[in-house]
Design a protein with these regions (language model features):
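Short strand-turn-strand beta-turns centered on an Asx-Gly dipeptide
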Residues: 102-104
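Short beta-strand-centered aromatic/proline hotspots
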Residues: 82-87
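Acidic loop->beta-strand submotif enriched in PP2C/PPM serine/threonine phosphatases
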Residues: 113-129
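Phosphate/adenylate-binding glycine loop and adjacent helical scaffold
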Residues: 134
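Protein maturation boundaries and topogenic segments
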Residues: 1-81, 149-153, 157-172
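Active-site loop architecture of trypsin-fold serine endopeptidases
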Residues: 138-145
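Short, solvent-exposed secondary-structure boundary/capping segments
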Residues: 94-98
Length: 172
């Protein structure tokens, strides 16, 4: 196929072909790179609100490690959850007197405005697993109740709200 093939096409065929190419590109982007995702529930208040629409970045973790305090989207038992990564592989996690301790050292959290009940993860987090929680701890169904999250269940990270427009922007 040469360039002359496209030049000699009739305009209607060119138009249809351009739509097909656009659709293929959009589907590839949606499948491999980014997709919109909707916050369902109050477990990430005050950082994220119920019904916020965000961008899920599916590609970053192919090139960088999951970091503490990243906001991630998880697929758990046919349900999608949005939570914050607190514990990384090889670490111990403890909440005591409303303070986070990683490996027995206090780690400041600037996003948690709710009281967190005392909690101790008895063993180290194994390789390939993460401890995640919601920012609104009293209502969050997270690793304290559903267990550690497998790395392959983390679909990507998110922090950018695209709707509603009055909340547009990066929410870390």
């Amino acid at each position: 196929m040469t360039l002359s093939f496209f030049v000699n096409m009739n305009d209607k065929v060119k138009e249809i072909l351009s739509y097909v190419i656009i659709i293929v590109i959009v589907l590839l982007i949606k499948h491999f790179i980014v997709i919109p995702i909707k916050v369902n529930g109050d477990s990430m208040n005050n950082t994220l609100k119920d019904k916020d629409i965000m961008i899920l970045d599916k590609i970053s973790y192919r090139f960088q490690d999951i970091k503490r305090f990243d906001i991630v989207v998880i697929k758990k038992d046919k349900e999608y959850l949005i939570k914050r990564v607190i514990g990384l592989p090889g670490e111990t996690v403890e909440y005591k007197n409303n303070k986070l301790y990683i490996n027995n050292k206090n780690v400041a959290e600037k996003f948690n405005h709710e009281e967190t009940p005392d909690f101790i993860l008895e063993e180290k987090i194994p390789e390939g697993y993460y401890f995640v929680v919601g920012d609104n701890r009293p209502v969050s169904n997270d690793s304290r109740y559903i267990g550690l999250i497998k790395e392959e269940d983390i679909l990507g990270k998110t922090s950018f709200v695209i709707f509603p427009f009055n909340r547009f922007g990066n929410k870390k």
